[in-house]
Design a protein with these regions (language model features):
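Basic, alpha-helical interaction scaffolds
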Residues: 182-235
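Catalytic palm subdomain of template-directed nucleic-acid polymerases
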Residues: 30-46, 119-144
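Inter-domain linker/hinge segments that demarcate the starts of reverse transcriptase
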Residues: 2-13, 132-149, 216
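Active-site palm subdomain of RNA-directed nucleic acid polymerases
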Residues: 15, 91-126
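Mobile genetic element proteins and their domesticated derivatives, centered on retroelements
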Residues: 6, 26, 43, 56, ...
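Short, conserved non-catalytic motifs in the polymerase core
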Residues: 1-4, 22-24, 67-93, 122-128, ...
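Short, conserved micro-motifs composed of acidic
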Residues: 71, 152-189
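Conserved pre-catalytic core of RNA-dependent polymerases
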Residues: 1-84
Length: 235
């Protein structure tokens, strides 16, 4: 899958004595900001079938929402954008909506990996300045795509990372200076992506520690239940 492909690319770069740079992008309320007109135009291009468009148009149009609080309902408000969450079609339509994003990245050394609304860009190089330039160019391209497609990047929740060996981190400066429309992107030593914590030396220590904590917690709960339920049930 996309996550294993991404980590394999990081490992290949480390084995080739290169440095990888990645930016983990956070799209603000991504599912809620999908523009219906743009989505329908993209569906027409992908499906090449105008007969099915009325179905999708009716699926998206005339939706309302209201709030229930303390036994009372608010007035209904029209839903003018976004795809229905909790539905089967919602995530599929969103993936089709952002499917053309990688095509707008002009620097072809930069790869774009998308897992639903988790978008990661990465590249690798033996020269750190080249790494910096490629990632910043890609961020500018993505910002332009987001403006055109009514998406919003949250620079405070977006993170960057330099992935290389621990020895290279110690002997050389590996600090990225990236920004999204003038807002600095924080560089981190580890980041959780789709449940997997990736660290900047690929030693997987943060992931192992988190996994051990979860296992320890579950074992403790099972030990407390040993006097309540049978051994077979605990298995």
């Amino acid at each position: 899958n996309a996550l294993s492909f991404l980590t394999d690319r990081f490992l290949s770069a480390v084995n080739a004595s290169e440095v990888s740079g990645a930016v983990f992008l956070d799209l603000t309320k991504a599912f809620d900001l999908v523009n219906h007109s743009i989505l329908l135009n993209k569906l027409y291009v992908y499906l090449k079938d105008s007969e099915s468009l009325p179905f999708f148009k009716s699926y998206l149009a005339d939706r309302t929402q209201r709030v229930y609080l303390h036994g009372s309902y608010s007035y209904e408000g029209k839903v003018l954008c976004g795809v229905p969450q909790g539905s089967v079609l919602g995530p599929i339509l969103f993936c089709l909506y952002i499917n053309d994003l990688p095509l707008h990245i002009t620097d072809k050394s930069v790869q774009c990996h998308m897992l639903a609304d988790d978008t990661t860009i990465e590249t690798h190089s033996s020269q750190f300045p080249d790494l910096q330039h490629s990632l910043q160019t890609a961020l500018s391209d993505i910002s332009a795509w987001c403006k055109h497609n009514h998406m919003v990047i949250n620079p405070r929740k977006s993170k960057s990372m330099v992935i290389t060996t621990r020895q290279k981190h110690q002997i050389s400066s590996s600090s990225l200076s990236l920004d999204i429309e003038g807002n600095k992107v924080e560089q981190v030593q580890s980041h959780k992506l789709s449940g997997l914590t990736i660290d900047d030396s690929l030693r997987w220590q943060p992931q192992i520690e988190q996994l051990c904590k979860r296992i320890s917690k579950n074992l403790f709960l099972l030990s407390r239940l040993q006097s309540v339920i049978s051994f077979e049930a605990r298995k």
